[in-house]
Amino acid sequence: MKKFIAIYILLAAILPAAVFAQVQRSAAFHDKYQLKEVVVLSRHNIRSPLSTNGSALSKMTTHQWTNWSSAASELTLKGGVLETEMGQFFRKWTVSEGLFKENQVPSVDEVNVYANSMQRCIATAAYFSTAFMPVGGLKVNHRYTPSTMDPVFNPVLTKVSDAFKAKAMEQINAMGGKAGLVGLAKSLKESYRNISRTLDYPQSEAYKELGDVKYDDTQITLVKGKEPGMKGTMKNFNSASDAFILQYYEEPDADKAAFGEKLTRDDWTSIAKVKDVYGDVLFTAPIVAANVAHPLLMYMKDELNSKNRKFTFLCGHDSNIASVNAALGVERYSLPNSIEKVTPIGSKVVYEKWIEKATGKEYVGVNLVYQSTDQLQQNAPLDLDHAPQVFPLSFKGLEKNADGLYSFEQINERFEQAVNAYDDIK
C-alpha cells in the first residue's frame, strides 16, 4: 500500500494534471477498459456550525464567531460554489470517459441523485447535479420534509444489547492501545492546547462550568434508536474543532478565522485532528459500523448492481463515509494536502465500474475525491487540467490487479459480508 501511494505521489508530481481525471489512467488502460458506471457517496459541502449567541460554542470563547451566510447547520453560499466546481469536474470527467455525451439528457434509470433530507445535503446535491448535467433536468430525490434525517443516511444503532455494548467498547478502547480512551484523549494534547489558546478558553464562560481539559472523562453512550454518543472533553472540543475548520474554509483571512492568532497549517491540522479522532471513536469500530451503516450499505450494493444505472450520487455526512468505509474494511489512510485527514468537507468516495473490453469482465476502482485545503479556501475552479485531489482506497484482505482494480465479484462479496455482519449482531 505504502509503495503504491509513493508511486502515485511521484507520478502526480511529474505528470500533467489532466492525466488525473480520477486516478492516473494510461492510454494502455483506456485501450483495455471502458467506464460503465459510477457510484458516489458524498459528504455535504461547507455548512454553518451552531455558533449563535447563547449556544454552547459561543460560551467556549470570548471571541465572536464568523457571521455565516446561512442559518445554523445549513449549506453556506461558499459551500454551494465549491460543490458546483465538483459537479463541473465530474461532468468533464464522465464525458471524457465516454460514459455520457456532452449536454446529455439521461433517462430516469441512468442517473440517480439521492440526498439525506437535511437542508445541507439536499442543497449540496442540487448544486452538484446542476453543474454535473446543466441541461439534464436532474431531480434531487429526498424522502422527507427538510430538515429530517432519512433512515438510509441516519447513523443510528438499531441493535443494542449487553453483548453488543461490550464488543463495541472493546473495539473502541483498542483504538487507544493499552491506555484505551485515555490514550486516545492524550494523543490530542497538542490539539486541545491549540484550540484552547485560540478560543481563549480559560477566560470563557464554559471554562467556569467545565474547568480544565481532562483526559479521563470520555464517556461513550450506545442507545438503540440513537447515534453513538459521547460526553466529556473530547466531545466539547470536537464542537470547537468542527467550527474552526469550517471558519477556516469560509473566512478569507486566516488570522481572522483564528481570532487573531498566528496559526500555521500544522496548527490547523492539529485542530482538525480532534474531529478526525472523534469520528473514528463513534463510527469506525467494526461492530458499530456494521450496525449504523447497514441501510446505506444495502442501498449502495443495489446501486452497484442496478442494470441500467450509469451514475449514482448519494449525499450524506462524514459519519456515513466513515462508517461505510469501516464496515467494508477499507484500510486506514491519511489524506495529503488537507487539514482533515479522513473525511474532508465535500469529500466523495467514488466507486468506478470498468468493463474489460476483451472479456466483458467487470472491475472496480475506489478512490476518495476531495478538494485540497487550498482549493477550498481559494474557490479554485476544477476541470481536467485542474483536478481535485484523488486518493486510491484499498480494502483489507483484497488484492488489486496490475491495473489497480478489484474484480467486481470481490467488491460485491465484500458488500455482502458487510451487510451480513449486521445479522450477526446479537
What do these predicted regions represent?
Residues Q22-E110, N116-T312, G316-K426:
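Signature for phosphate-centric chemistry
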Residues M1-Q24:
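Bacterial Sec-dependent N-terminal signal peptides
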